[in-house]
Amino acid sequence: MPTPLLSVEVGPARLEVVVADITTLAVDAIVNAANTSLLGGGGVDGAIHRAAGRELLEECSTLGGCATGSARITRGYKLPAKHVIHAVGPVWSGGKKNEPDLLASCYRTALNLTAENGLHSIAFPAISTGVFRFPAGLAARIALGTVVSEISTNARGIDRVVFCYFSQESAVYHINAFAELGLD
């Protein structure tokens, strides 16, 4: 596991910011920034599908897709993570189509699936900030605020939440969000 750039205790859980390839993380579940088909795509979605192997695509094809703001869980197959939680974030349309609430729903749903499946650790990418063009700073504040709220009120066995970024430059958004919430 990479050394965290930031690590903070919130209730019973440790929240961490790391720079790493999410497909290499040995956690109970990694979150895939998926599209509604769940059949793979570019960015982190494509990387997760490639690393997990064809069995992931086969399982995803049986799920019938997923609505924006929601998530589905599959096995991790060839990944170090036991499971993949496929969260479908919103495409940014200037904030006029309920995008912040839909993004928060992705994080809540992923945490719910983690707890419902008896899992204890989860790693999130920056959902919707790539080709879906969600502003990275706003997305980081929504992600962290949602996770802190959920973990503080009802952790349900989740003891580790990792926010995983592909570069130091992108991780700064999350570090700033921690500071804005007074968690640094």
Language-model features: where?
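Phosphate/ribose-phosphate-bearing ligand recognition and processing surfaces
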Residues: 91-184
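Glycine-/small-residue-enriched capping loops at alpha/beta junctions
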Residues: 1-116
